């Protein structure tokens, strides 16, 4: 897989295609150690919802990247993570709300070839069916969201 500059994310939250059937929210302190807690929480919840293993693995990676970005780049004290499974149980939406007051949009920095960090949103772009960011309606900052189609 070749990673390039992330394309601009969608700036509006698309309307849900169907009425949500299952929803789960949890908050965490914005600490480096919270990524592990988030991964464990998401993995446990999606297994309880009996989602396919591939979907669970992709969702765990997405949450890990989103929370790591929030911790490293937003100055937030807390983050709020939401999982929503649509009524047809085929679409999983992941939301990460932070306390960042910076303008909504893709980051300015692009990782160079020798840099170890700076490719998280490229992974999000490659793994998610769709993703974007907008002003949060649940926190004082923004929300970065990603959607997956559950593997059959």
What does each of the following model-derived ranges do?
Residues 58-76:
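Histidine-centered phosphotransfer motif of kinases
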């Amino acid at each position: 897989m070749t990673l390039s500059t992330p394309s601009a994310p969608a700036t509006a939250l698309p309307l849900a295609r169907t009425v949500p059937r299952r929803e789960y929210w949890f908050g965490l302190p914005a600490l480096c150690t919270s990524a592990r807690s988030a991964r464990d929480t998401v993995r446990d919840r999606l297994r309880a919802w009996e989602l396919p293993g591939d979907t669970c693995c992709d969702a765990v990676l997405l949450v890990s990247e989103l929370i790591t970005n929030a911790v490293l780049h937003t100055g937030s004290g807390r983050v709020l993570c939401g999982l929503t499974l649509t009524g047809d149980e085929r679409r999983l939406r992941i939301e990460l709300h932070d306390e960042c007051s910076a303008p909504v949009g893709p980051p300015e920095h692009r990782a160079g070839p020798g840099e170890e960090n700076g490719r998280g949103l490229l992974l999000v772009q490659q793994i998610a069916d769709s993703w974007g960011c907008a002003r949060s309606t649940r926190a004082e900052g923004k929300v970065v969201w990603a959607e997956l189609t559950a593997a059959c």
